């Protein structure tokens, strides 16, 4: 467990044999945690190879073709954070990494608790998986994890004293740097774990309410579908704003609307009491399971109001 995915990802990167395997393969659809860190490592001379995230249908195949014996790690999301598109075929990447002795890191942040995620069904038994509870798990800040595959013997350079906790009571001087068993080899040092107790309480609430990943997926698909249908019924010119195209079963936990005026849509909705966010030219509408259909439809009505207001301003300019 960790406070954020960055501290966990960097510990993993520090364990890789980058001096003899300097290649890192990734996509341009990764969240800034990975994107920024890899950009900086590239400045230091590592061979960071980046491919287009879309079309997502072919992303796994395109990443796989780039894996070779110089590849230390492939870093890819299971759901694209900008568009909510589910990336298929991660097992193909996993097999390629296994053949070449490379590591696979899957960012599942936008997958968890909104789309069922089965490590074994996805063929990711030997993959590292990172994610957190800030979004769909609704755990608040400070709840992230790194799933470590069984039998891992990596020795991270960035390592804290929690990783040798079991060795501390022994007498005498330490002989070299020892690591704990299993995932503890990636442990850090002292931090405030209060957030984990909050997370445990939230998960207990989910269990009490019967909010399983499968049920949450059904709720999410209904809500996102409702938003999509309501937006498309507005009949806004697609050159101005349109739903990011993908099949409904490939869309995860939010509706992405592409518009050159994403910033203005965001602020216009916010002044009307609708909280969204935007990434570049994409407005993201992410419904929580406790919102009613009427509230969601009202948000689209207010989006229409924002659109009409912007159009009026443009005519008067």
Task: Describe the function of each predicted region.
Residues 179-229:
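Structural signature of PLP-dependent enzymes
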Residues 123-175:
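Active-site PLP attachment segment
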Residues 56-113, 128, 136:
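Active-site phosphate-binding strand-loop segment of PLP-dependent enzymes
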Residues 218-228, 232-272:
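Conserved PLP-binding catalytic core of the aspartate aminotransferase-like
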Residues 1-20, 32:
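Conserved beta-loop-alpha segment that forms the PLP phosphate-binding cup at the N-terminus of a helix
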Residues 65, 263, 267-317:
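PLP-dependent enzyme catalytic core of the Aspartate aminotransferase-like
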Residues 26-76:
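PLP-dependent aminotransferase-class I/II
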């Amino acid at each position: 467990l960790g406070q954020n995915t960055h501290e966990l990802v960097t510990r993993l990167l520090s364990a890789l044999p980058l001096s003899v395997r300097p290649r890192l393969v990734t996509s341009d659809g990764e969240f800034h945690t990975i994107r920024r860190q890899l950009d900086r490592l590239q400045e230091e001379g590592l061979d960071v190879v980046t491919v287009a995230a879309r079309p997502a249908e072919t992303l796994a195949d395109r990443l796989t073709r780039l894996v070779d014996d110089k590849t230390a790690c492939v870093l890819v999301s299971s759901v694209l954070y900008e568009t909510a598109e589910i990336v298929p075929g991660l097992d193909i990447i996993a097999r390629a990494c296994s053949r070449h002795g490379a590591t696979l890191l899957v960012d599942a942040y936008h997958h968890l608790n909104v789309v069922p995620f089965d490590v074994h069904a996805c063929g990711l038994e030997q993959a590292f998986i990172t994610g957190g509870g800030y979004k769909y798990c609704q755990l608040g800040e400070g709840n992230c994890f790194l799933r470590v595959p069984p039998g891992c013997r990596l020795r991270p350079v960035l390592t804290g004293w929690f990783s040798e906790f079991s060795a501390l009571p022994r007498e005498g001087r330490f002989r070299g740097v020892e690591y704990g068993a299993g995932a503890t080899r990636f442990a850090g040092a002292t931090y405030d774990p209060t957030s984990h107790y909050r997370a445990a309480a939230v998960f207990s609430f989910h269990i009490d309410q019967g909010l399983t990943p499968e049920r949450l997926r059904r709720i999410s698909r209904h809500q996102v579908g409702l938003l999509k249908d309501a937006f498309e019924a507005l009949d806004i010119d697609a050159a101005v704003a349109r739903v990011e195209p993908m099949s409904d079963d490939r869309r995860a936990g939010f509706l992405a609307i592409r518009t050159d005026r994403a910033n203005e849509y965001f602020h216009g909705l916010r002044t009307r009491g609708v909280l969204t966010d935007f990434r570049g030219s994409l407005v993201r509408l992410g419904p929580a399971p406790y919102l009613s259909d009427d509230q969601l439809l009202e948000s689209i009505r207010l989006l229409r109001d924002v659109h009409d207001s912007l159009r009026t301003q443009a005519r008067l300019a």
